[in-house]
Amino acid sequence: MAPAPVPALGTLGCYRFLFNPRQHLGPSFPARRYGAPRRLCFLPQNTGTPLRVLPSVFWSPPSRKKPVLSARNSRMFGHLSPVRIPHLRGKFNLRLPSLDEQVIPARLPKMEVRAEEPKEATEVKDQVETQEQEDNKRGPCSNGEAASTSRPLETQGNPTSPRYNPRPLEGNVQLKSLTENNQTDKAQVHAVSFYSKGHGVASSHSPAGGFPRGRTPPARQHG
């Protein structure tokens, strides 16, 4: 092989600083007491926009379209993965109650209903009781009056029975009172007219002659 070319002496003077940086004659700070001299560090120039100047941006009106989540955007909101439900190893028999067992019959409260007597029946009953008390106070009645009072009561029946009609009883009571008043008036008129004519009445209270006390029989004229 051919030997490597040897550089010229002039060129070696340029590259000797690469191998021995201490011999570099560039600007440097004064050497420290312990260590090599410090080099200046040149900062790269900022090629961006100057301060307080906004970059030019093309502004467009907001669109009315709804944003559509893509595969890339979905990762930003969270990783969506299907939920896996583990399989049940054992079998469970669920027994649901039937409809017949769930239905509970409703129990209605028992309410005692008392049949109220009509007002007319109670009024008539009170009238009958007062009439009986008045009859007892007056004393024993004649046979005709007793029969007349007993017949309508027997025919009408019990006033508290459901088939009892209170209206006929009121009419019978009124008719009874009217007939009694008429009988007493007729008896008084008959007695007054009989005594006014001068006829005698034979009674248990009159004397033997058949004339009332305090009166003399009229003299008979002999022809």
Swiss-Prot record:
InterPro entries to which the protein is assigned, alphabetical? POM121-like_prot_1
**Chain residue ranges for the region called Disordered:** 110-223
The lineage's top-level taxon is Eukaryota
Basic and acidic residues: compositionally biased ranges: 110-138
Q: Name one Pfam family in it.
A: POM121
Q: Where is the composition biased (Polar residues)?
A: 145-163, 174-186
Q: Which PANTHER family match?
A: POM121-LIKE (PTHR15566), UPF0607 PROTEIN ENSP00000332738-RELATED (PTHR15566:SF7)
Stated family? Belongs to the UPF0607 family.
Protein name in the entry: Putative UPF0607 protein LOC392364
